[in-house]
Amino acid sequence: MIVCIAEKPSVAKDIADVLGAKTKHDGYIEGNGYQVTWTFGHLCTLKEPHDYTPNWKNWSLGSLPMIPPRFGIKLIEDKGIEKQFKIIESLMQKADGIINCGDAGQEGELIQRWVMQKAGAKCPVKRLWISSLTEESIREGFSRLQDQDAFKSLYEAGLCRAIGDWLLGMNATRLYTMKYRSGNSRQILSIGRVQTPTLALVVNRQKEIENFKPEQYWELKTVYRDTTFSYTKGKFTKIEDGQALLEEIRPLNFVITDVTRKEGKDYAPRLFDLTSLQVECNRKYGYSADDTLKTIQSLYEKKITTYPRVDTTFLSDDIYPKCPGILKGLKDYAQFTAPLEGIRLPKTKRVFDNSKVTDHHAIIPTGVYPNNLTPQERAVFDLIARRFIAVFYPDCLYAQTTVLGKAGRAEFKTTGREILKPGWRVLFDKEKQEDKQDDEERILPQFTVDESGPHAPELQEKWTTPPKPYTEATLLRAMETAGKLVNDEELRDAMKENGIGRPSTRAAIIETLYKRGYMRKEKKNLYPTPTGTGLIDLIHEELLKSAELTGIWEKHLREIERGQYQPAQFMDELKQMVTTLVHDVLSDNSSRL
């Protein structure tokens, strides 16, 4: 008998249907030589400190650092979990073979490996690796099962991540709580490898806002033929300098000195990875990162979209032949897919690039018709569907006109933009109107060199503005790029290696900061609470709050996943870091409160 183990009951049912397993038992489905069972996400977890030695049960500075000689796992204490595990254990003990059907990612690999280890599974194990839950995808996956050994590095990276989080979280939380909490306070100062640098980003931004001192400046503009031109030499920090130039040029004619027209093109937006989808949903609809993750997970389980926990915006070449069929399935978008029928779809490196795809490709529709969706599911699906269609549309062609002029010695400039062929933009016309992006197209009057006439100059008073508070959208981007502000897509791809956390965990980190009372949300804006600010002020060690240092850890974990970095080396470095941290904090006699 072959035992298949999935990550949740609904996925197990989809797999059982494809395999022809029809007989339902308590905790599994059987038939056609298969027993299909399931977990409920994590059934096992790393042991707690007191599971290793009674000396680590009570919190004390003398017991730090806590570094077990060998890490172990245990069942999560829950009656439902214990019951399901006994069923899984019984099936695996008698199995001729096991097929790991867990989510195709690092966390999914860890969940199932721990269960198999705890169950004492001894038979050969194969791995099902699929990017969607459609019948076609499941059948295709079972036709090319892989040996579990091929995913050893993925498991090792997940294990190192879990142990790293345990070592730093357990030791640093006890260390700071016992060393610095005041008097008889029972407050726990919770510190985490990812949550603390993320909180530091929000705290530091708030301090920048509070410490910001607005500075006054003036900009010189002039209006000629109902068109506003800007002075090219920048702003004035002294009003008298700007006023003097204004008075000098007021009586003079404005002369057009140069007119340049260049044609260019805008490419369609990239397909979504999880973070960019969360960013767009927060920007457009105000959905939290956690809400978006739950929604896209639901769409995946309904077989409507592909695997969501991805960090690439590209497709692999093997998806290309399936694209016409997916487009055909988008029946509600027939007005947009009709022009693509019967033509050879374009295949560009901006969309199809095997070198940019590792475990999974970008999030796209599967072609299954979306029935019975909630309004939120419908809104998220709409974003994904339109992006997918758009990448096969022609580029948007535009003409940019730059006009230079002068009045006396003062030089001015204005630019205009005219859409020549909208191309892919036709899919987003409604969105453009809703977002009031009326500056997208600015058509200038016809200007000719050497024409001249009266103009109306004015000096506009301005003030420098403070940085904006983070929203979930901008915080996700900052986590992705380790705190660096990056707008360019290509640079964003390069920075992903060093981001804080993983796409699949960032929403949970943000939710943790809310739940622990370290951060609050006001409308879309995020603010640290006094408790959150106090915690970051308390931490002097850059190791704990530096986004860049945490990003380097993430890079090593990704290298372990690719077999380019030794897990043992990572663990040795981690243990040394924790030991040094404990020593430094215990040696600190200053008052940080």
Predicted regions and their residues:
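Intrinsically disordered, low-complexity regulatory segments
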Residues: 1-170, 453, 466
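Basic, low-complexity terminal or inter-domain segments flanking catalytic cores
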Residues: 2-3, 81, 118, 173, ...
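Conserved short loop/turn motifs at secondary-structure junctions
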Residues: 1, 102-104, 185-188, 261-270, ...
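OB-fold/S1-family RNA-binding modules
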Residues: 49, 94-99, 227-237, 242-249, ...
